[in-house]
Regions:
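Short loop/turn motifs that connect adjacent beta-strands in outer-membrane beta-barrel proteins
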Residues: 21-36, 72, 100-105, 119-120, ...
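Short glycine/proline- and aromatic-enriched beta-strand/turn motifs that initiate or cap beta-hairpins
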Residues: 21-83
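Residues that define the transmembrane beta-barrel architecture of outer-membrane proteins
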Residues: 33-35, 57-61, 87-91, 104, ...
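Transmembrane beta-strands of outer-membrane beta-barrel proteins
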Residues: 37-41, 63, 73-75, 93, ...
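Transmembrane beta-strands of outer-membrane beta-barrel pores
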Residues: 43-49, 79-83, 99-101, 112-116, ...
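Glycine- and aromatic-enriched membrane insertion/assembly motifs of diderm outer-membrane
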Residues: 56-112, 218
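Detector for outer-membrane/organellar transmembrane beta-barrel domains
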Residues: 124-204
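Outer-membrane beta-barrel "beta-signal"
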Residues: 218, 222, 241-253
Length: 253
């Protein structure tokens, strides 16, 4: 048993040294080139995408990596588990340009959805634009502020369905709960499938639906960002749009 603890202590020390070296090398890279590297991992009890279940209410782990440049340009990749598809996985690649203009933060980019093992027809691009800001409300608290945002996106040939256009509109707001480490956010969105024909089942036989989320953020719990979310998609027919709750844990480094 003593030997086990010695080995464990040695492993933990080596891990800390490795992280320190990693942080140092990333810091050196950013100073020399303006390029930053970030990693993230998460676990969710249910993967819900714009009101639609992607994991049939099963848990979904995910991992991602991001490259950013001081100019505002960025690239990233993300992968998570789903219940559909040959290999039960979704792989996303994205790139764009983020910048600030006065009190507003803008983001313009392209997100490519890929489903390994499926035909190329199921993969598609989503061209997006978002704007957000932070509004201080000193009448509530000296450091209190709310953070609203607007997200607009256009996806041609959505999931390979015979549809010329799909538009996404989403707006949300987040605020801390004074005197606590908690935060609360509300998201409302719409998926609009234009001129649906052919593979209508890929849009669940509806031309559009609304969805919303209410999320309670717990801050950092045991080194992980934790949250609980209630979701609903009132205009979506079928089990994939049923309301419910899910919890999420995440970490970035």
């Amino acid at each position: 048993m003593k030997k086990f603890y010695v080995l464990l202590s040695t492993a933990l020390l080596a891990s800390k040294i490795s992280y320190a070296e990693l942080d140092l090398s990333r810091e050196s890279l950013e100073k020399a080139t303006g390029i930053s590297v970030g990693y993230n991992t998460s676990w969710s009890s249910h993967y819900v995408w714009r009101g639609e279940s992607q994991s049939s209410k099963d848990m979904s782990p995910a991992i991602g990596v991001d490259l950013g440049h001081s100019s505002g340009l960025y690239l990233g990749a993300w992968s998570g588990s789903i219940t559909n598809g040959v290999y039960g996985a979704e792989f996303d690649v994205y790139g764009g340009f983020a910048f600030d203009l006065g009190p507003f933060s803008f983001d313009i980019g392209d997100l490519y959805y890929l489903y390994p093992g499926e035909s190329n027809e199921t993969s598609f691009n989503e061209y997006y634009f978002s704007v957000g800001t932070e509004i201080p409300l000193k009448m509530i608290g000296e450091d209190f502020s709310v953070s609203p945002y607007l997200y607009l996106a256009y996806a041609p040939k959505w999931f390979g369905a015979n549809t010329p256009d799909v538009f996404y509109t989403e707006a949300g707001i987040e605020a801390p709960i004074p005197g606590t480490p908690l935060s609360i956010s509300y998201t409302y969105g719409n998926v609009d499938v234009d001129d649906l024909e052919g593979d209508a089942e890929k849009a669940n036989d509806v031309d559009s639906w609304d969805y919303y989320y209410v999320t309670l953020g717990f801050g950092e719990v045991l080194g992980l960002d934790a949250s609980a979310t209630y979701h609903n998609a009132p205009g979506y027919s079928g089990d994939a749009g049923q309301d419910g709750f899910f919890v999420s844990l995440g970490h970035e480094w």
